[in-house]
């Protein structure tokens, strides 16, 4: 069976980020669209395994939307708002997406906790648009956890980064749910004129988790061996 994956292509020149529209947070990167598309079957197979589902025999990425960007796409800087992220949410849809974002946080925490020495690294120093690339498990965890306040603030929700990654994210959703009209998914102009919506925030959490979980898992596997590291994301 062939599974066609609708994708949004964000690019700066040829540098490409490719996002799976219906598999929230699933993404690939590449020096060209062709490279990013070639990686998508593996990403979707991993994502489905993470969900406890079987992957089909064949997966094909199909670009349905394009965003040309001036950002450092090669470093996963992104400001795209999908057309599909502008529609209101049903309560069931929201609960499903929230559950995925909270599962992602719990799995990120499990991966982090499994690493024997959280100050070890096998990654060279490198600077990106947001500063030095996180190199140790501690640095990756803190960086990933500490977008919580920022992401929620972009849709006018007061949140913080206190506690672990799951706890602060869960509190953020509780603060969101105190707003009577949150399911309307209003599009808001946030920092630097970037468009945000609740749907985008839900995607961003899982996408950002996956970026740094992949980096953490690969680094830790190199240092300690795969047998010693949890792999809840099924990379």
Regions found by a protein language model. Give the residues of each.
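Extreme N-terminal starter segment of soluble prokaryotic enzymes
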Residues: 1-5
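A short mid-domain helix/strand-loop element embedded in enzyme catalytic domains
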Residues: 76-88, 101-125, 141-150
């Amino acid at each position: 069976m062939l599974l066609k994956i609708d994708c949004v292509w964000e690019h700066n020149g040829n540098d490409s980020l490719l996002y799976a529209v219906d598999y929230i947070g699933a993404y690939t990167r590449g020096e060209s669209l062709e490279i990013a598309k070639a990686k998508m079957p593996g990403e979707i197979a991993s994502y489905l395994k993470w969900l406890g589902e079987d992957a089909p025999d064949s997966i094909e990425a199909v670009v349905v939307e394009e965003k040309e960007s001036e950002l450092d796409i090669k470093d996963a800087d992104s400001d795209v708002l999908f057309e599909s992220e502008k529609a209101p949410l049903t309560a069931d849809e929201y609960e499903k997406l929230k559950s995925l974002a909270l599962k992602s946080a719990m799995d990120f925490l499990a991966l982090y906790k499994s690493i024997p020495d959280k100050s070890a690294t096998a990654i060279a120093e490198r600077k990106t648009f947001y500063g030095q690339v996180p190199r140790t498990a501690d640095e990756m965890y803190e960086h990933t956890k500490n977008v919580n306040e920022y992401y929620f603030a972009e849709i006018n929700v007061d949140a913080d980064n206190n506690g672990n990654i799951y706890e602060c994210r869960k509190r953020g959703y509780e603060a969101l749910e105190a707003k009577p009209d949150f399911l309307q998914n209003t599009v808001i102009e946030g920092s630097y004129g970037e468009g945000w919506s609740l749907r985008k925030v839900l995607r961003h959490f899982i996408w950002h988790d996956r970026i740094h979980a992949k980096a953490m898992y690969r680094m830790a596997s190199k240092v300690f061996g795969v047998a010693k590291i949890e792999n809840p994301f099924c990379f």
